[in-house]
Amino acid sequence: MENSRRDMMAGACAATAMTFAPAALAAWEPSQRYPDPAVQSLDPSFNKYRLALAGVERLATGCRFNEGAVYFGDARCLLWSDIPNNRIMRWDEETGRISIFRQPSNHANGITRDRQGRLITCEHSGRRLTRTEYDGAITVLIDRFEGKRLNGTNDVVVTRSAGS
């Protein structure tokens, strides 16, 4: 039997995965030293913002591409987007428990809070910017500009309006 290029590539990928998988799946342990030597600044000008006694903690596994984290101090939880898995995740600060806040999320990306504390979400597949009301209802804030659908809403920041 003759091996095809596809067979060779599949074998190479499998060998690579077997080589690096143990390191990727190894138990993660937080640093016992401060400042955490695993946290490195690529730009020295950032060092003035680094907290010497702050470390890195793993909150969750099973996510594929996380983005848009926003902290809700009043609810003591952290929300973030897991874009490829089409969900918004929630970490409860009091229990340490991870749960799904919303799925599907329309491939939510950037998220933040408005000045009233509601969740504002950029939705890739919805091609829109939405607000989650206190009762859980979703309000579309914008999905078109000059009559055309938005394309790839990404990150969002809420600022004060003029005069407020």
Which residues make up each language-model segment?
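Sequence-structural signature of mature extracellular/luminal beta-sheet repeat domains
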Residues: 2-3, 9-13, 25-164
